[in-house]
Amino acid sequence: MNGMDYIQQILNDDDINILLQKSNQTYHLQSICINNSNFTSSEIELSCRLAFLLIGLSFHENTNPKWAEYAYKLLKNIHIKENEDREIFDKIMGYELDNVSLIYYFYLSSLALILDKTISARLDLKQFVDFEDVESSWSQRVLAGIFKALFFLIRKSDGFEDIRRAISEISNLQKEQVKFEDQYLNQFDVQTQKEEALILVGLYHTSKALTETAEYLINGYNYKKRIDNVVRQHIDIALDLIPSDVRLRDFISIINKDLQSLIRHSIWNGTAFQDQIKKLCEFKSSHNILELLPSQRQAMQQNLFDVYANASIVQMPTSAGKTMLAEFNIVLTKSLRKDAKVVYVVPSRALVNQVYFDLRKDLSAIGFNVERTSSASEIDPTEADFLIADDVDVIVSTPEKLDLLIRRSHPSVEDVSLFIIDEAHTIEN
């Protein structure tokens, strides 16, 4: 029996299966704000042990993705702010840190990232409470600072402000290094002193990987280095310097995966192929939109921007980022033909106004003019004038008003380069 089969056999155990089902039910109840957490101490302990086992496997290649999901939901069973749960967690999953909640939130947010639950990771980290100067040794302070800086990079609750907090966290460690490092190392014998010094240098390289990622997230297209290579170089050095502390090596390896996820999810990644797209992304970043949602990234990977396609269909839930993808398509269409006109069709008058204001806010920043049709059942003279103006780039309309314009052979819809149909399945109704 290989290792994978052995893990699956454990998961098929009746008691484990009941716990996993209960965790899944509790997780979904919590997602609709129903707190039905009634786990016994023995169930919390089993949750910790099983989560610890699955976490160790979840960040390796070719691992069953369900294991990360199981581990994430098991951790959600644990109320780390409650003394009993925290003590159980510390006994099983703790490390050389006084503030064990750092490890809890590190695992929780890292699992969320690997599962592409970026919003869940950010929401989870809003629950994290920072305790100042709680760590007793210098190496603990450095590791705690690295965790906190990582949390800021993932959370982004204040956009660039959280990213700057991450940089500040590492900067404070650099200032404290002069005060605490020698004092910390001098307490050891020569051999141990050498080992501890190498561990510290490894942690410093890990912190450098964090600050480089933060600089990339802030500077975007102006960051001149290959950020993925920079991060990998610092992490590789850190792992080489820490050969024997298996747990610390695991932390650093997971941090590497977290940083690579943040880079891939960034609004700067994969959007530098066209100048106007870059300008749009820079505008959005100034309004604290710093990463693409999973649905947006997936759509971009599936050749949504194929300019030779006659039609593209995107099926996404509400608030999944369709408008931003539409804006990218508008910009690409205009880049191919400066006088191109785009008609954006939405199913209701209320949505006409909403989409109009959203598009105008974003696209006017890069010089595009957005107009909307009126709610009138006929075409009034004022409307007719602005719809055929040469500087109109995008028209937002309901299907009914568009149908009227087409039936009247109105000049505004004679030469349209791109139709964007929102809620296309409702048009027949």
Question: Model-derived features: where do they sit?
Answer:
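N-terminal helicase ATP-binding lobe
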Residues: M1-N429
